[in-house]
Structure formats: C-alpha cells, structure tokens
A protein has these predicted regions:
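Glycine-centered small-residue hotspots that permit tight backbone geometry or close packing
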Residues: 1-2, 104
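Catalytic beta/alpha-barrel core
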Residues: 2-4, 19-29, 41-54, 65-76, ...
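A broad, low-specificity signal for short, low-complexity segments enriched in glycine/proline
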Residues: 4-7, 27-31, 87-89, 125-127
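Aromatic/hydrophobic pocket-lining residues that form the small-molecule binding cavity
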Residues: 5-12, 52, 79, 146, ...
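Active-site loop-to-helix "anion-binding N-cap" substructures in soluble metabolic enzymes
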Residues: 10, 14, 33, 53-61
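A generic structural signal for short, solvent-exposed coil/turn residues
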Residues: 15-17, 88
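Conserved structured catalytic cores and adjacent interaction surfaces
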Residues: 36
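Catalytic alpha/beta core domains of metabolic enzymes, predominantly
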Residues: 57-155
Length: 155
C-alpha cells in the first residue's frame, strides 16, 4: 500500500532541500507526471514502460529532465525512438539508462557495445549495474541476482 504518492514525494523534496542532491522518481502513468514534477528534479521512465508514448510525452511536458531506462527487450539503437518522443514534445533534457538485456529466460547481461551506441544520440548514458545483474523469476518465483559481481562489472 505504501505511504501515498504525495507524502513520498515530499520526503524526496526534503532530501533535495536538506542535502542539495538531485532527486529522481519513477512515474508509471501519464497522469502522475505533473504532480511528481512539483517535487523532484528527474522523472524516470521504467524499462517496461519505455515505449509508452503518452507517458514519455506527459513527462516531457513538465520540463524536467527525463531518464528513460532501456527495456531489456530493446536494442540500444531503439532507444533513439523513446528519446525522440521526449524531444518532439519540446524537452531536450534526456538521459538514457542501460540496465541489461534479456539473456535466455532467467538472466540479464550487459552488452557494453550498447553504451557508445546510445551515447551517439548525444544524451548522457547511465549504467545501472545492479539491475543488469538481476536474475528475474527464478524457479522459486523470486527474482535473484549476482550482487557479488557488482564491483567487477562496475569497473
């Protein structure tokens, strides 16, 4: 259930004010963009929603920086289309996040060739190492991972 969107966003705003660090939150529906933009610096589009035009456009129209996480089902080059939707809505503040590619049924891997491909679009690219080491939906129905590899992969 959680504490509620507005209360959570106010906590993020307080973190920004207190520590002077940029804050980010995921949005999952177009109607969440305006309220979230009142409280945080960066709106993040989750990987599974990175192709949702209405969500990308609503986020873009807030004027905030938009971080689009690459879906594990997309090629790095396909992220240009998601970025274009934000740009065409009048917002040039785009970041892209690489967070792994599906490898078989229960594994994600990083294809490092995708980073310069996405950088070629002219936007900052983030590597989300922890998500890229995920092992979704293991045989027990729980997502696992390989945290012991975080430091190695991050280098």
């Amino acid at each position: 259930m959680g504490i509620g969107d507005e209360k959570a966003l106010k906590i993020l705003q307080k973190v920004h004010t207190t520590f002077g660090v940029p804050t980010v939150t995921d949005i999952h529906a177009a109607e969440e963009a305006t309220m979230a933009a009142e409280y945080v610096d960066i709106l993040q589009i989750p990987a599974f929603l990175c192709r949702q035009t209405d969500l990308l456009v609503a986020a873009a129209k807030t004027g905030k920086t938009i971080n689009i996480k690459k879906g594990q089902f997309l090629s790095p080059l396909a992220m240009q289309f998601a970025a274009d939707k934000v740009i065409e809505a009048g917002n040039k503040n785009v970041m892209l996040t690489e967070r792994g590619t599906t490898f078989g049924y229960q594994d994600l891997v990083i294809d490092y060739r995708g980073i310069p491909e996405m950088q070629s679009f002219g936007y900052p690219v983030i590597l989300d190492v922890t998500h890229s080491l995920q092992q979704p939906n293991q045989t027990n129905g729980v997502t696992g991972g390989m945290p012991q590899l975080i430091e190695t992969v991050a280098k």
